[in-house]
Amino acid sequence: KSYLEEFELPYLRIPGFQKIKNNDIVVFNWPVDTMLNMYYTDKYHYKPIDKKTNYVKRSVGIAGDTLEIKEGYVYINGKKNELSDRAELQFSYLVQPKNRTFSKKVMVNNYDITDPFGIINRENTYQFIAMSDKTVDRFKNHPNVGSVEKYLSIEGERDSNIFPHNENYNWNNDFFGPIYIPKAGTTIDLNIENLPLYKRVIEVYENNTLKVNENNIFINGELAQDYTFKQDYYWLMGDNRHNSQDSRAWGFVPFDHVVGKPVFKWMSWNTNGKGFNKIRWDRMFTTVHGEGTPTSYFVPFLVFLGIYFGIKKWKKYKKED
C-alpha cells in the first residue's frame, strides 16, 4: 500500500479553466474503489480519492439533469442526447449467418471489428459485443450475413448488476431511469423509495451518518425528510454501450473525483495488429475534443524533434570548433 491511513491531508484542488458540459470526455477517479464495491456500493469504501484508479468516460449527464435510457439511448431532460460526429456509439448485435462461420481476421481487417464475437446457441447465432452503426451498415452486405438484430435487454427486466442494485428498481443497461443527477445546493424530498439512489452520495461522498429505523431516515442523528446536496455530480458512460463499466454500474461520480478533461491522444495501440501495425499511426497525437475527423500532429511533432536535436547538435559542434 502506497499511503498511510493514519495521516491524510484535507481535499484540495486547483481551480479549473472550464466547466464540464454535457458529452465532454472526462478523466476521473473511479468512485467505487474495487470490482466488489461496484455491485455493493453502500458497503465498502477504502481508498483516498487520489489513490483511486483513473477512468475515462463521457459525461452524458451533468448536475441538475434528469437522465433516462431508452433502448440503449440516453435522454436528458426528456430529449434524446445528440453526440458529435466524432463519437461512435457501439451496441451488441445478434447475427444469423447463412451457412458458415465468420473469420476473425476478416472481421478485423475488413470491418474493423475488434471486440469479441462468438456463437451463443444451437442455431449458430453469433453475438457481436460491439459494432457502430457505420460498421453494421457495411457488415450487412457480407455474403454470409442472413440477418442482423440489435441485442437489447427487455424493458422492465431487472439486472442486479445495475445501479442502484435494489429489487425495487427494475432497470438494466438499455432501460434505465429516470433519475435526477444531484446539483450542489439543490434540495430533494428524501424517502424510503428514493433512498437507494442517494444513499452513497449522502453517506460516503458527503460524509454523513445515515440510519434507517422502520420507514424513518436519520441523518447525523436527526430525522430527515429532505436533503440538500453539497457538491455537483455527473453521470459518466462509455460509447461502447454494451461493454462498458460506467455509471450504470456504480452510479453518480462526485465533482471531487473529477481529474479533468483529456486534451491530447499521444498513443493508440491495436492489440490485433502485428509489428508496426500494432500502433494506430493515424490516431497518434490527435486532439480528443472537437468536430470532424481528428487531425494527427505526429509528423509536425517529428519535424519539431528533428529541428530541436539538429540545433542542439549544431551548437555542440560550434562550441567544440
Predicted regions: what is each one?
Residues 1-321:
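Extended hydrophobic leader/signal-anchor segments used for secretion and membrane insertion
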